[in-house]
Amino acid sequence: MAYCSFCNKSHNVGFISTRFAGTDGVSLETAKWADVYDRVGFTSYFFAGELDHPPERSFLVEEAHFQHPDIKDVFRNCFGARIRARFVTRKIHELKRKIKDRLYEFIEKFEIDLIVPENALTIPLNIPLGI
């Protein structure tokens, strides 16, 4: 178990995004931040729809990925349409609830102290994840 170099207690940081895999910018920048947190005594964990991190530090939620069929359907119905149909709003909230429930599981399983969202709030590829 790692201990924080500032307070000598253990802390867990949870990174959240659609994907932490490969060499895209978000994955590379998150790896840098995880290294910084790890060097000061935090332990890093990852929540996403695609992961290439060790399973003991990963929490896979398929609906978090922007390529998930339901997420792609929401995206298609929100962008390029002048009016959003009510079924789309219902679907967004249904998916949001599912992702939120899994997020609580992630927080509890890894005893997360700090959440770091990576592009989940700024880029609307996965609207339910951003909500």
Name each model feature, range by range:
Residues T23, H53-E56, I123-N126:
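Short catalytic/ligand-binding loop motif for oxyanion handling, primarily in non-cytosolic enzymes
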Residues V26-Y37:
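Short amphipathic alpha-helix
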Residues C4-T23, L114-L121:
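Nucleotide-activated donor-dependent transferases that construct or modify glycoconjugates
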Residues P128-I131:
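Charged helix-capping and loop-helix junction motifs
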Residues V88-R90, N119-T122:
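Surface-exposed cleft-lining segments at the edges of enzyme active sites
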Residues A2, C7-S10, V36-L114:
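A conserved catalytic-core segment of Leloir-type glycosyltransferases
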Residues T18, E29, D52-H53:
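Short, electropositive, low-hydrophobicity segments enriched in small/polar residues
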